[in-house]
UniProtKB/Swiss-Prot annotation:
Biased composition (Basic and acidic residues): 575-590
SMART domains assigned to the protein according to its UniProt record, in alphabetical order: E2F_TDP
Superkingdom field: Eukaryota
Annotated gene: e2f7
Protein name as it appears in the record: Transcription factor E2F7
Species name: Xenopus tropicalis
Length: 862
């Protein structure tokens, strides 16, 4: 068996013979002969693919494959750097990008080659700055025009001082707000349409504020009414609802008016361009004015942007394509944002058939006249030069200028009169200087009184109680003259009772006159109220005839519940303030009191035209009459004709509060119901007839008038006796009969001087109170028994008191002294002194006066 050697690596590498070993050469020759084909074939695989040497030892030369062995695929490893993928993408990019990068590298300085390591750091820093810029960039809401307008308006005051001129630089405002200048232009154009700013130069505006805003809005409303925008709004609203509306002719007329009517307050240089240039008509300023007009003339004050855009597109005669409509809506939305920032409109939502869509509602001023007056009152009085400048700068018409100018002058006059009243009424000295009293103080007081009493007079006139209402309210202001004041009769007559129960006429007795208080006042026709400087009460007492005493029961003008006149109890409750008013009555600058207080307006016309009666049964009336007749004292007769009554104070004397309150002096008026007295009527002045017809009321005998001594000096009483039939016609002008003329005994009077301690009587039963009249319910009749013992003292002191008061017959004085002759300061104790110091009057009549000695007659009770 032949042994062959294995093929080694040495054999593959070198094919040369080794001459040093002949044996080997023989063997190699033999091998070459044997393996001739294999000598060439192993070289071919070396070129194509390497041989796996690890397997060569197990293979024989015969077993070596001719084709190469396929190597198993392995997964590729991750890239070495994070930017390997980026580099691969850059390499795959277009050649233009690579050429651009090459050009940048060519133009870079040579030094950059040394600092290539810092390029990556700079790129990282740039990326961080970009992130910060994105965070600092404002949001869409922050860039809105409404918020930008609020920031712009916050830089300037709404009502700047007229002396300061504020200039707006658009470049400065844009840089400070961090926006482009075109955004500031949008705001300024809308503000210029409302005259809040005015253009001075390029990018320079003057700030005026909202001083003239109401006037501008009023003018815009006037122009909008001329353009008939209200009909156009209604037309488009009905069109949206699918209804037909005939407004084509109105729209044509509106377009003609619009072409002929220039908008307000355009400068002289702008007026020709406005009428000729369509570009000027489409400007944001003109569009803003028209948009505001739509709000001012609208009835609902709500406008949608669609309707506004349609009206403005038709007005500008543009092609109504969709692109123009969207442009108009965007421009109107910018205007609405600025107006919202000004507080003139607000955004609302309107629901219609198509759904919910946004709209804007007007919340700005509507009544411009009232706000103008309010603003003028709060401002200071300008100088004449500034008034002229304001009138020249005013954008209103000539008619409005004249009205505003008159109003400013009225403010000046009003302030002067206010200062004059303040100086005249200032209590700088205890006695006012001699001279005529200023009527401004009277006018101010009476104006305040008019506001209180006028609603009541109007209510009465509506109910038909006042027949002649030509003068709803009038007063009598006392002015010093050279003669006595006379009582003028009222034209219309008011019946108090029926004609069957009336036998004698009655008139009004004016208060007695003195040198210090000469204050008889005349009545004006249709005069509901009368103002008197002194507290005076007119008393009308009516009486039925003696023969009809049993047929006709007591009648009273004290109203029933529901009437406006007070009852006797209400009148008594309102008298506790009388001492204060009596003291103020003698002061020259005291507020002049009315005849009627707030609670005691017995002069209500309703209570006069309708006789309001509270009747009593004959048994109750006779019981009261017997009790009073038992305590009746004889009185002295009077024979004076045409005498007048003295002042009785401003209210009816109370009859219940006797010695209950020490601070308030006891005061009461006591009239017993004798056999001839069946009615007691009180009439407080002064809006009714002063002279009644002779067949209206019966006269009255007043046997008792009881007054305490503390109030005697301030409240004297003088009653007149019977008036003859011949003289009654001449005394009807302002005087009253208290007794029946020629048929009955003359009037009897007792004035009680001392204070009478009267115990409080028990109150009547409830069932009797309901049936009795106010005079019968009052506990006056119960006081008679306790007052009998003091009646003689009352009579003796009444004679002394009656001598203090001279003849009540008025005589014309030489000169009427003003009302401010009294001392400026008075104490409550000086009332008696002032009344006792009244000078005596000369007696002009020959008839016996009331100051004669009173005869005490026990049989004079009738």
């Amino acid at each position: 068996m032949e042994v062959t050697s294995c093929l080694t690596l040495k054999d593959l590498i070198s094919t040369k013979k080794n001459k040093s070993d002949p044996v080997a050469d023989g063997r190699s020759a033999q091998k070459e002969n044997m393996f001739d084909r294999f000598k060439i074939s192993p070289r071919l695989p070396l070129r194509s693919e390497p041989i796996d040497l690890s397997k060569q030892k197990s293979f024989t030369p015969e077993r070596i494959p001719v084709t190469p062995v396929k190597v198993a695929e392995r997964p590729q490893a991750d890239p070495w750097t994070p930017t390997a993928n980026l580099k691969m993408l850059i390499s795959a990019a277009s050649p233009e990008i690579r050429d651009r990068e090459k050009k940048k590298e060519l133009f870079r300085p040579i030094e950059n080659n040394g600092i290539e390591e810092t390029d990556t750091d700079l790129q990282l820093m740039d990326s961080v700055d970009d992130i910060d810029d994105l965070e600092k960039r404002p949001s869409r809401k922050q860039k809105s025009l409404g918020l930008l307008c609020q920031k712009f308006l916050a830089r300037y005051p709404s009502y700047p001082i007229s002396t300061e001129k504020m200039t707006i630089s658009l470049d400065e405002a844009a840089s400070s707000l961090g926006v482009e200048r075109r955004r500031i232009y949008d705001i300024v154009n809308v503000l210029e349409s409302l005259h809040l700013v005015s253009r001075v130069a390029k990018n320079q505006y003057c700030w005026h504020g909202q001083h003239n805003l109401n006037e501008t809005l009023r003018n815009l409303q006037h122009i909008g009414e001329k353009q008939n925008y209200r009909a156009q709004i209604a037309c488009f609203n009905l069109r949206d609802m699918g209804m037909e509306y005939k407004c084509d002719e109105q729209e044509k007329g509106c377009h003609i008016d619009h072409l002929n009517t220039p908008l307000i307050e355009l400068s002289e240089a702008d007026c020709p361009s406005v009428s000729s240039s369509s570009r000027k008509d489409k400007s944001l300023r003109i569009m803003s004015q028209k948009f505001v007009m739509l709000f001012l003339v609208s009835t609902t004050k709500i406008i949608t942007l669609e309707i506004a855009a349609k009206i403005l597109i038709e007005e500008s005669q543009d092609a109504a394509d969709h692109s123009k409509f969207k442009t108009k809506v965007r421009r109107l939305y910018d205007i609405a944002n600025v107006l919202t920032s000004l507080g003139l409109i607000k955004k609302v939502h309107v629901t219609d058939e198509r759904g919910r869509k946004p709209a804007f509602k007007w919340i700005g001023p509507v009544d411009f006249t009232a706000e103008d007056q309010k603003m003028e009152v709060t401002t200071t009085i300008p100088s004449p030069d500034s008034k002229k400048d304001a009138c020249n700068l005013s954008p209103a018409s000539d008619r409005v200028k004249q009205r505003l100018f008159r109003h400013s002058s009225f403010n000046i006059v009003q302030s002067f009169s206010a200062v004059k009243r303040k100086v005249c009424s200032h209590p700088c000295s205890p006695q006012k200087p001699q001279g005529v009293e200023s009527s401004d103080s009277y006018a101010s007081k009476m104006a305040h009184l008019a506001t209180i009493c006028k609603p009541k007079a109007e209510e009465d006139s509506k109910n038909g109680n006042i027949e002649n209402s030509s003068l709803p309210f009038s007063v009598v202001v006392p002015m010093p003259v050279d003669s006595d004041y006379r009582v003028k009769p009222v034209v219309h007559q008011v019946p108090l009772v029926s004609h069957k129960t009336v036998c004698e006429p009655l008139g009004i007795m004016p208060p007695s006159q003195s040198n210090e208080d000469c204050t008889n006042h005349g009545f004006v026709p249709n005069q509901p109220y009368m103002y008197l400087p002194s507290n005076s009460v007119f008393m009308l007492c009516g009486n039925l005839s003696e023969g009809k005493a049993t047929d006709h029961l007591a009648m009273s003008l004290y109203p029933v519940p529901g009437s406006d006149s007070p009852t006797l109890e209400e009148t008594t409750m309102s008298k506790q303030e009388r001492p204060t008013k009596r003291q103020l009555n003698d002061k020259d600058d005291a507020p002049l009191s009315l005849v009627l207080p707030k609670k005691s307006r017995v002069d209500n016309t309703q209570s006069l035209q309708k006789p309001i009666c509270k009747t009593t049964t004959p048994e109750q009336l006779q019981h009261v009459s017997r009790e009073e007749e038992y305590n009746t004292e004889p009185v002295t007769k009077h024979s004076n004709v045409g005498e007048t009554t003295e002042e009785v104070g401003s209210r009816i004397l109370p009859h219940e509060n006797v010695h209950l309150h020490p601070a308030v002096p006891p005061q009461f008026l006591y009239v017993p119901t004798t056999q001839g007295l069946n009615s007691f009527n009180f009439l407080l002045p002064a809006n009714h007839s002063a002279g009644l017809s002779q067949s209206q009321l019966a006269s009255l005998n007043v046997p008792y008038v009881m007054v305490p001594s503390s109030a005697l000096t301030a409240f004297p009483f003088i009653c007149s006796p019977a008036v003859s039939s011949g003289a009654s016609g001449s005394t009807l002008n302002g005087r009253m009969n208290f007794s029946q003329a020629g048929t009955s005994s003359p009037t009897r009077l007792i004035i009680g001087a001392p204070q009478m301690a009267v115990p409080q009587p028990p109150e009547p039963a409830v069932d009797q109170t309901k049936n009795l009249s106010p005079l019968s319910v009052s506990p006056v009749s119960a006081k008679c028994a306790s007052s009998k013992a003091d009646s003689h003292d009352s009579l003796s002191q009444s004679i002394h008191t009656a001598k203090l008061h001279k003849s009540p017959t008025p005589s014309t004085p030489k000169s009427i002294r003003p009302l401010h002759k009294d001392a400026f300061f008075k104490t409550p104790g000086s009332l008696d002194v002032s009344s006792s110091r009244k000078p005596q009057r000369t007696q002009t009549r020959t008839s016996s006066s009331a100051q004669r000695k009173l005869d005490i007659d026990s049989s004079a009770g009738n």
